[in-house]
Amino acid sequence: MYHHEDDTNSDMNSDDDMSRSGRETPPPRPSHAFGSERDLERRGRSRDVEPRDRWPYTRNPRSRLPQRDLSLPVMSRPHFGLDRDDDRRSMDYESRSQDAESYQNVVELKEDKKPQNPIQDNLENYRKLLSLGVQLAEDDRHSHMTQGHSSRSKRTAYPSTSRGLKPMPEAKKPSHRRGICEDESSHGVIMEKFIKDVARNPKSGRARELNERPPPRFPRPNDNWKDSSSSRRESVIQERGYEGSAFRGGFRFNADLASRSRALERKRRYHFDSDERGSGHEHKSCVRKKPFECGAEMRQAMSMGNLNSPSFSESQSIDFGANPYVCDECGRQFSVISEFVEHQIMHTRENLYEYGESFIHSVAVNEVQKGQGGGKRFECKECGETFSRSAALAEHRQIHAREYLAECRDQEDEETIMPSPTFSELQKMYGKDKFYECKVCKETFLHSSALIEHQKIHGRGNSDDRDNERERERDRLRARAREQRERERERERERELGEPFLTCPNFNEFRKMYRKDKIYECKVCGESFLHLSSLREHQKIHTRGNPFENKSRMCEETFVPSQSLRRRQKTYREKLFDFNNARDALMGNSDSSEHQKNRSRRNFFEGRGFEKPFVESQKSHTITRPPENKDDDKPFTISVNPNDKLKFPIMENGSQGKSYERSVIHSLGSAEAQKSHGGLGFSKPRPVAESSTQSSSSIYYPRAHSGGNTYEGKEYKDSIIHSLPAPRPLKRHRANDHIQCDEGGESSIYIPDIINKGRKIPAREDAYEGSSSSNYHTPNVSRAEPPSLSGESHDSKQDVTFSVPSSSVREHQKARAKKKYIEPRNNETSVIHSLPFGELLAGHRRAKFFECQECGEAFARRSELIEHQKIHDRERPSGSRHYERSVIRSLAPSDPQTSYAQERFIQEQVRKFRAFGQRSTTSNNLSVQKIYAQETFNAEEPHDKETHGQKIHDKEPYGKEPSGKEPHGDEPQDKEPLDQEMRSEEPHDDKPHGQEPHDDKPHGQEPHDDKPHGQEPHGDEPHGQEPHGDEPHDKEPIDQEMRSEEPHSEESHGDEPHGEESHGQEKVEDATIQASVSEEHQKDDAGDAIYECQDCGLGFTDLNDLTSHQDTHSRKALVDSREYAHSEVHAHSVSEFEKKCSGEKLYECPKCGESFIHSSLLFEHQRVHEQDQLYSVKACDDAFIALLPVRPRRNCTVERNPAVSGSAIRCRQCGQGFIHSSALNEHMRQHRDNEIMEQSELSDEIFIQGLALTEYQGSETEEKLFECTICGECFFTAKQLGDHHTKVHKDEPYEYGPSYTHASFLTEPLRKHIPLYECKDCGQSFLDDTVIAERMVFHPEREGGSEIVAATAQEVEANVLIPQEVLRIQGSNAEAAEPEVEAAEPEVEAAEPEVEAAEPNGEAEGPDGEAAEPDGEAEQPNGEAEQPNGDADEPDGAGIEDPEERADEPEEDVEEPEGDADEPDGADIEDPEEEGEDQEIEVEEPYYNCHECAETFASSSAFGEHLKSHASVIIFEPANAPGECSGYIERASTSAGGAEQADDKYFKCDVCGQLFNDRLSLARHQNSHTG
């Protein structure tokens, strides 16, 4: 088979020869026309048809014969054309010409001879071909590798071009590449078959129709054409046409026939090219085509197809319409020789299609299979499945083909279509720079995409997986080492600079942009990620478990903030400012509300008394250490990142240092409102030399003053928390912050308040309290301050008047009147100070880790730490007893502009509280920041005109603004002692403070570290003079105490505002709770105004509704003054944003620890505690669950962050976790019910009915009260037990246990052996152990024992006979209920337990008092008469008296042990055998004792009438005392008048408690229960 390249570049140069012969001596027209047409067709095919190597079938060599003469190459081509591309340019042309010429000479010698046998000719020609065949095949392969690359490159998208590729093995070559006799040993086989075929039929039918064809004339391929005469040439052609027809197959008669043949052949052979584009399809879907296991088979087939045609006669005419090729074995005709060859192969091989190896899509072969198969089935060689049609097999084979292709993709494609050229050859063709080499297997590729595809193979292999895994592990190790080196460098910088160093978030962005390192590493498994989102997804693997079980490990994981937090961070993305000393990018301060939220969380837990110190990284406003040189005013930032070394001073219990007690906290703007200046202009600070800046969002925290406890007997145990969200600062505010640092490296920062600068809260604890160099330069933010509304006069306490704010502020308030909350306030909630943030003025370096103090986890962002700490928040026990009152964190949405409509509410609240003697409410007002409502004993007590720690200093740095006058309003009296106390704890130096009337402090200058406040370094600004208003007296001691805790230093403050105080001990701010919500959060949360009642915490949307509601409180007093004595704390508002993000329950009951998301729910819950008579159960105070099922807000953080997922609600008694509080409610009810049962004496028999029983069914831990006596299975209800008996034990024998009560069960005989009780004295056996106990007392061997035994035997006989009579009345089968008199038999004695237990109170006392024994038996805990089986209330025949038995008893033994004399049931039924002996019965006067009222009746009629009065009680009495048949009926001790007594007695059903007059009615009724 030849390509178009092969034809154009033939070894024989046929085209060139033809063109030259056409110019010099033109060939005959048919030949020339044929050749021209073929040339044109070949050129067109070279452009339009895919390369030859893409053809799925072998080409017929007929298309090459017009170029050839009747020379040796003519015979060689059919044999070798199919196995090479016939690129023979490398052969020597002269040698081939000589071979052709010598062969022509041989032909000329035979010219005059008679044509010999064609077999001999063929044999001779074939031998001559052998001399050239092998060499030509090798040369052809070589020429193909060197020149056929262009077409081969198209056969696969990514050809493999590895070095030194070996030729493809013969077994793996596709069908169209095999069939050429490359092996010399196979030639003989081919020729033998050929000779046999010709010998069998010299004129084979495959060309019998073509004998009359004229011999075709072919041009010579060389110049000998000119030397030969025309007649000679024609005769030779004719002769060779006859003689060589067997080799040529009788084709190529003229141009039209050749064209038609080629068209037919192309139509069949190239149908893949038109559909699947040839080689691409062949490579993908026909990879497994290996139809010939041996190349000799194909060579044999091709030899047959081309050489076996017999010669045809010259006289035969040409029939173009007939099929020229006829199979000798089956007679099938073919028009194309290739189809005929393929068909012949089927006959020459037993098993053509090795379906385990390949499958050939051949229409002709399929046709043959259909014709030959008949009923034959087609079998798949791989799986053995058979098919009746080849099409089904073909479809089935496609499945295996796909599997094979999948396997081939996992390994290098060794079954290439054609032998690939060597690497050196490809380099010669394409150049040495255009190859891609696989580093694993050293294989090269022309395209990078091919290399990528190839490398996937190595990725799927096990060894390659290990290599890749090792490579990835090396990458991780390198990343870890790199991070470790970075951490080491950071530690070195810390040691050099004295402060921790951390890359800021912006620097991480730089690393992402420029380095593309894997900077996100999982702390659990060490895997690194380039993006945070990838790390989040990865961490879900580690956090799917319970976070409380993996607490220690969870804390080591990198915290992943939630998506909502990310979105919020984008709203106030920190700005990049500058680099300093090649350090990290500096960022501006983010919102101070985030700082305050950290602070509030810290105080939330510290106030609750958790022993663990507050996490330093949670501290709200931290600062990087300023330059050590106090004169070096380099810019630095009051950063959000906390300094690990700096700590908050912790204020505990009003600065008393008492742990776990409530703190006294004042809100930020409380005292400032009382001392706010009347008309201050805007401050314009003078710029500092080196632009010391601070973010305007940072705010001065006023010093936390512990308002004296209103209850003087308790020293600050209960915090008096006043809170007001500070109003938004006006837009014009500038900052001057110049902070000096002490030598110890500790810095103190005071965040200025929104309006005033006077009050301060120390934000750091001075680690070096005794240091004399503890100078702090505190930033001061000047802001326009509105006039004070609450502290203008001394009488603000009496008639709290509210000044109207300025017009501009009022207009803004009106605009936002509907967008402000008066947040719900719990009685026990701590203050969260809302600190609105302003504009970012400057950003400076910060170098701090945000580290969680609890688990040691460090974070690069504060927000991540906040989200992380929510995990610890949920793990903390909410009901801990380490603190007296629970501190509930609540965050006020510090919307800067408070609702204008709330002013009326504030006034109303003040009036109400003054009227009721309660503390005045706190309110959110722009001008009124806090009202200190005092208790009745100090409500009228004014303070002197001093304001300590609350003064607003109007002094601006550098004297650019004159000091404003500060009118001091009334402040609570308890603030002064606290102020003094705080000052008293400060180590004082001998530097003079200014001149101040109280505490020796100048007005407008607060002593801070004993610095002369009047002598500031930049003292070009006069100190503001503050007119002092009346201040409560109790404020001064607290103020002094706070000052006393502050370490004083000898250095003067540079630009520090007056009134600033250094950081005291950590106790000072132990429970200082501050929080704020950013403006974005406030905008989101702003909605309709909610007004909350300060008494009960109930919220209202309308102010009028709140006013009306508060009138109800004026008409009632607190239920429990003890309980609310310390509930003077006004809860702060809870921001909806905090609820949504944190998912925490913010309102907690101080008594039981239950948390609620709204104060109204807490109010409803606290009402329950007031009803002690309803909830007096043990442990109610510890683990009470609200009656109203609380539906906690769904934790959004848990949904977004699986690290905090799990059961966050736990039972405080057993520690069991629950997802929802409703489940905990049910669980706690079980605890209460269990405690009730433990306290009850009859807890084992108490059957909780109704709702209580249904609650028991809801839990698996509760006791199952109904037990099956047969199989021991327990059930919650009697109905379930009955259904169990009906379904499971329907056909099983009944074992009458303690719960047997119904007479209907006696209808079925016992089918199970019942254990007997043997008497040790006499050896007799009894069914019931009570009989043995009585027998031990009344043993026959003892005195009087024989009579008792006889009476007992008669009693048993009566008990067995009576049910028979009853069952007869009911219509039951007498045979089934036939009584057995013998007491020793189980069937007879089975009725004994049921009968004997009928007496609840025993028999009536006889003369000898023996009735005490049964009576005592009835009083056993189980309510049974000493019978363990408990069938005491058996209704059937228990009370039927035996007259004969009574007659035999002596008078002193009138009382029978079993007490059958007064049995009510069945008394009217007499034993027939005993009727004749009634006259002998000696009867004693009967009496009846009522169990209810202890009355005694002589007649049964009177007793019956008396019982009717108790009928209602008897009917509804719960059946909680098994063993009592009629419950309240006393039987007579004698048998006199037994028949008459039965009429007046009542029989009670033990199932439902219904009473009946006769036993028959009771038996019928009980049948309804038993079905």
UniProtKB/Swiss-Prot annotation:
Protein name as it appears in the record: Paternally-expressed gene 3 protein
Domain notes: The SCAN domain enables PEG3 homo- or heterodimerization to control gene expression in a combinatorial fashion.
Subcellular location: Nucleus; Cytoplasm
Gene: Peg3
Expression by tissue: Brain, glial cells, neurons, skeletal muscle, uterus and placenta. In the placenta it is found in all trophoblast cells.
Cellular component annotations (GO), alphabetically ordered: autophagosome; nucleus
Coiled coil: none
Subunit structure, interactors included: Homodimer. Interacts with SIAH1A and SIAH2. Interacts with TRAF2.
Inducing factors: Induced during p53/TP53 mediated apoptosis. Up-regulated by DNA damage in cortical neurons in the presence of p53/TP53.
Sequence repeats: 942-946, 967-971, 987-991, 992-996, 997-1001, 1002-1006, 1007-1011, 1012-1016, 1017-1021, 1022-1026, 1027-1031, 1032-1036, 1047-1051
